[in-house]
């Protein structure tokens, strides 16, 4: 979040228009730092860069940013008991506010993504939300990389998880690339 604030202040100092500032903020803050490095490594490991005909998935955060849409099932920063909300406590379905964002607001945004896109739900909580939305018929016809490990440094098992899921992930990416 610090990166987002810094980019916003920089844009204001440059007297940029608000639309440009917000685009630059999203670009700078989307999976910044170690989480971005881990994500790029895993995307490259799965061949996403080859499927979109670029040298590395890192270009999705730079010169090929128009190919990437990042979002969240809960669109705004959430803090619980003074700490960043991890998606676990409280469980989304135990909070009317979180439930509204995950199951009502998010599907509206998600339905606007042009099909067929490659969708990468990051983490078990997101996969559980997607599973429920799918059962309710609220997920568009996209290609979903279920089982893709969360790239957070806190996920010390991500390399093992990627290895275990790699065959399935490669198959989905290949199907999406050959559409």
Where are these regions (language model features)?
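Flexible loop residues that form catalytic
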Residues: 124
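A short helix-to-beta-strand connector/capping loop
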Residues: 66, 141-143
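Short helix-capping segments at alpha-helix termini
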Residues: 135-141
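Short, charged, surface-exposed secondary-structure boundary motifs
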Residues: 150-160
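A polyanion-binding, active-site-adjacent surface
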Residues: 1-118, 127-131, 156-157, 164-176
